[in-house]
Design a protein with these regions (language model features):
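Intrinsically disordered, low-complexity protein-interaction/activation regions
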Residues: 1-148
């Protein structure tokens, strides 16, 4: 039914799993731009947006079993970039298995936004029973996190 559903990314910690889930979530609205603007007005909007992104990340991090207050600070590139690199490395290792591995990669688009090229309607999760498969966008929890 889902040929790639049995694939499991190895050597990823909850921080990377939560980050990937965040990118899946944010890709539906164009991705996340971490570049700081130069004007004061744009900087204020950027900081507000980054607070919301960090809050979403904390909620997702908690879903993976982490303590929200211990979630890595994504605004710091020295923390975020190695996490993205590790996710990419693990995805590349599955290049022979995944149909089009580039679609799964976190990439910067022409606007400078980091996103994953998987349509939200194709993102699913299974419930308690492995046969219960739901679209991520239909999840109430996913919608609450997205609304922040």
């Amino acid at each position: 039914r889902f040929p790639e559903a049995d694939i499991k990314l190895e050597k990823l910690h909850r921080r990377e799993k939560a980050l990937y889930a965040l990118f899946l979530l944010e890709s539906a609205s164009g991705g996340i731009n971490f570049s700081k603007p130069t004007t004061p007005r744009q900087l204020a909007k950027y900081e507000k947006r980054m607070v919301a992104v960090q809050e979403k990340y904390k909620l997702i991090y908690k879903k993976f079993g982490g303590e929200p207050q211990n979630a890595p600070n994504l605004t710091m590139s020295e923390i975020r970039l190695p996490m993205i690199a590790l996710i990419k490395k693990q995805l590349k290792a599955l290049g022979e298995i995944l149909f089009n591995v580039d679609d799964y990669m976190i990439q910067r688009n022409m606007f400078g936004n980091y996103c994953v090229n998987i349509h939200p309607s194709l993102c699913c999760f299974c419930g308690v029973n492995a046969n219960d498969i739901y679209k991520l966008s239909d999840s109430e929890e996913w919608q609450k996190i997205s609304a922040l």
